C-alpha cells in the first residue's frame, strides 16, 4: 500500500463532497478538479488546483474537453512498479494521480426530463467515463470512487490505513466502477 498523495475530483453529484474533502484535506492529499466541481471546492474553502492550470491546457469547446489530457491519463494509468512508466512520467512532468473521484453527467435523468436534443447531447459524459475506465484498469495503484454513497467507505479505509487503500478495497471499487461505466454506456 502506498499513501494517496493526489486526488482528481470531477463530480456532477456534489452531495457529501464537503465530508470527503475534510478527510482528504486532513491527510494532506492534493486536490485537482475541473469546472463546477472546482468552483464548489473553492466555495467550500478547500485548496485545489484547477485541471486547466494542472495540465497547462485550457478547457476548450465550451467545456467539452477538460480532462482528456495525457497528463491526467498518464498520471492515472502509470504502473507504479514499472520503471519505463516512471521514466515517462518524469520525462513529461506528469505526477501520479492516486485517487479518482468521478460521477457522470446525469444523461439518463436529462433524457427522461426533456425533449431538448441539445441539452440531452451536452449531458453525455466523455471525460468522466474515460477517467473511471483508466482508474479501474489500474486498480493495483489507483482508487476509483464513482458515487457519494462510497465516500463513507473510502473515509473509513483511509483512516484505518493511514491515508492508504488496500488492494481488496481498490478491487471492489474498480468492479463497481466498471459496472457503472457499462451501464452508463
Label for each model-derived stretch:
Residues 18-21, 62-68, 131-134:
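Short, flexible, solvent-exposed loop/turn segments with mixed acidic/basic and small polar residues
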Residues 2-5, 94-185:
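Internal alpha/beta core interface subdomains
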Residues 36-107:
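Glycine-rich nucleotide/cofactor/substrate-binding loop typically near the N-terminus or early
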Residues 9-10, 30-35, 49-53, 78, ...:
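General beta-strand structural signal in soluble alpha/beta enzymes
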Residues 3-7, 70-77, 116-117:
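Short, basic, glycine/proline-bearing loop/turn elements
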Residues 16-17, 84, 129:
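Short glycine/serine/threonine-rich phosphate/pyrophosphate-binding segments
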Residues 1-32, 36-54:
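N-terminal glycine-/serine-/threonine-rich phosphate-binding loop
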Amino acid at each position: 500500500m502506498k499513501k494517496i498523495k493526489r486526488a482528481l475530483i470531477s463530480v456532477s453529484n456534489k452531495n457529501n463532497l464537503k465530508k470527503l474533502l475534510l478527510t482528504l484535506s486532513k491527510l494532506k492529499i492534493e486536490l485537482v478538479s475541473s469546472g463546477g466541481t472546482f468552483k464548489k471546492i473553492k466555495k467550500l474553502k478547500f485548496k485545489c488546483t484547477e485541471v486547466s492550470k494542472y495540465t497547462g491546457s485550457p478547457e476548450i469547446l465550451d467545456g467539452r474537453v477538460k480532462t482528456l489530457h495525457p497528463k491526467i491519463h498518464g498520471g492515472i494509468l502509470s504502473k507504479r512498479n514499472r520503471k519505463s512508466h516512471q521514466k515517462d512520467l518524469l520525462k513529461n512532468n506528469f505526477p501520479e494521480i492516486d485517487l479518482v473521484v468521478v460521477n457522470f453527467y446525469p444523461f439518463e435523468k436529462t433524457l427522461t426530463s426533456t425533449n431538448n436534443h441539445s441539452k440531452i447531447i451536452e449531458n453525455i459524459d466523455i471525460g468522466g467515463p474515460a477517467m473511471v475506465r483508466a482508474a479501474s484498469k489500474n486498480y493495483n495503484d489507483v482508487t476509483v470512487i464513482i458515487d457519494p454513497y462510497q465516500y463513507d467507505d473510502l473515509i473509513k479505509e483511509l483512516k484505518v490505513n493511514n491515508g492508504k487503500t488496500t488492494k481488496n478495497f481498490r478491487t471492489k471499487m474498480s468492479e463497481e466502477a466498471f459496472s457503472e461505466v457499462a451501464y452508463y454506456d
